[in-house]
Amino acid sequence: MTTKEQFFFKGATSKNKIHFISLGCSRNLVDSEVMLGILLKAGYEATELLREADYLILNTCGFLKAARDESTDYLQRIINEKKETAKIILTGCMVSKHKEELKPWLPYVHYVLGSGDVEHILSAIESKESGEKLSSKSYLEMGEVPRKLSTPKHYAYLKIAEGCRKRCAFCIIPTIKGGLRSKPLEQVMKEFRLLLKMGVKEIILIAQDLGDYGKDLSKDRKSCLYSVLREMLKEPGNYWIRMLYLYPDEVDDTLIDLMEKDQRLLPYVDIPLQHINNRVLKKMLRTTSREQILDLLTKLRTRIPHIYIRSSLIVGFPGETEEEFQELVNFVGEGWIDNLGIFSYSQEKGSLAAEMPDQIPQSVKSKRLKILSQTQKKNVEKHNKQFVGKIVEAVIDGYHPDSEFLLTARFYGQAPEVDPCIIVNEARLVSGFGERYLIEITGYVGYDLVGRVVNKVPGE
């Protein structure tokens, strides 16, 4: 797994300049946005220049070894490049679970905050005692927390819960983030309305397990996701709601009904399946079987033919045989999944799977990863060919990272950052980013579609 760094900045002139680097997932990004909001509200200014900053905050990712390596690489860079008087504040998942890996760098770190301990960022910066360790406490418990969005102004992530009650054998997230802690419905709605008021047009709901939302709050331990979605959809406006991290056992008829009835709840679901073989799923401690997965996918495709399904799969889990891997290849080859993230199993200390026998050699895992990736690439190429000549409604995100002569756009089946996009090479009609346009698909490059703007969507 690779992490995506996010830098936060604007023009800074004071002596209280801060420089943020946020690594990892969108959930980490939300924490960084809250910390940034707290500091800006307190009078600090953000700078894009590392050497200019008085305080450097690194929000680490500790999910996989590759992510931890990236975190320590960034930490070393900060130590090497910062000005002599600058202070380093370290936070995030790696701090909570893998502090021993940080030992060589800790003498250079001035403050350490636990994962999710974002509301104490101001206390950390203003503390007189270098190296103070602040208690871990999620900002979800706070009623009023400022936030500075780092995403383009037209979309934002809304984290509705923290932690996870599931205990998948390969995962250490519960030991990092703790158990499920849901925001109260009133707080979620307050944040939702605020984002709409700020002009956000696409709100992406996230949690470790979105479908578990509210099970820690309700007396019957049932999910409250349907209730919060229903409340959100009562708000007027032509906005999009996108759901990420929705486990297969939590997708029920009530959610499907909502997607059918209100187009603002996008016909897009991110369902981490991890595998399709029953024996492997059982060893992973997953709660769904092959039969249940296929029943769910069939229902989704039948009820909502235009739905887009994103998922993640793991190859090389301990004991995975060639036959079981081939079953996974066949499943992917059937084209059930539109957007797919494929990961090679990582032996994470503290996970149940790390102690399992029959660990798969890295060479075998790499080979299986390549085979499965090639299988999905064929699906994508076939799918993209069928798109050529069609006109889709898409939002213009901004300039393409490789060229300001190109723009990037997304239709409802593409989530930002994790999915492919539309490369727009004819955009004379575009008057602003964050607006929706009709785009004719003229071709494709790899996983991305290519298109030209035909017209602006009426009402935009």
From Swiss-Prot:
Q: HAMAP family in the record, alphabetically?
A: MTTase_RimO (MF_01865)
State where [4Fe-4S] cluster 2 binds: C164, C168, C171
NCBIfam families for this protein: 30S ribosomal protein S12 methylthiotransferase RimO (TIGR01125), MiaB/RimO family radical SAM methylthiotransferase (TIGR00089)
Q: Where in the numbering of this chain does the TRAM domain appear?
A: 385-455
Record function comment: Catalyzes the methylthiolation of an aspartic acid residue of ribosomal protein uS12.
| Keyword Iron-sulfur annotated | yes
Q: Which InterPro entries match?
A: Elp3/MiaA/NifB-like_rSAM, Methylthiotransferase, Methylthiotransferase_CS, Methylthiotransferase_N, Methylthiotransferase_N_sf, NA-bd_OB-fold, Ribosomal_uS12_MeSTrfase_RimO, rSAM
Q: Which GO terms describe its biological process?
A: tRNA modification
Q: Which Pfam families match?
A: Radical_SAM, TRAM_2, UPF0004
List, for all copies, the residue spans of the domain called MTTase N-terminal. 16-130
Its lineage reads: Bacteria, Pseudomonadati, Chlamydiota, Chlamydiia, Chlamydiales
Q: How is the cofactor bound?
A: Binds 2 [4Fe-4S] clusters. One cluster is coordinated with 3 cysteines and an exchangeable S-adenosyl-L-methionine.
Q: Which UniProt keywords apply?
A: 4Fe-4S, Cytoplasm, Iron, Iron-sulfur, Metal-binding, S-adenosyl-L-methionine, Transferase
State its cofactor.
[4Fe-4S] cluster
Q: What is this protein called?
A: Ribosomal protein uS12 methylthiotransferase RimO
Q: Where does [4Fe-4S] cluster 1 bind?
A: C25, C61, C93
Molecular function in Gene Ontology: 4 iron, 4 sulfur cluster binding; aspartic acid methylthiotransferase activity; metal ion binding; protein methylthiotransferase activity
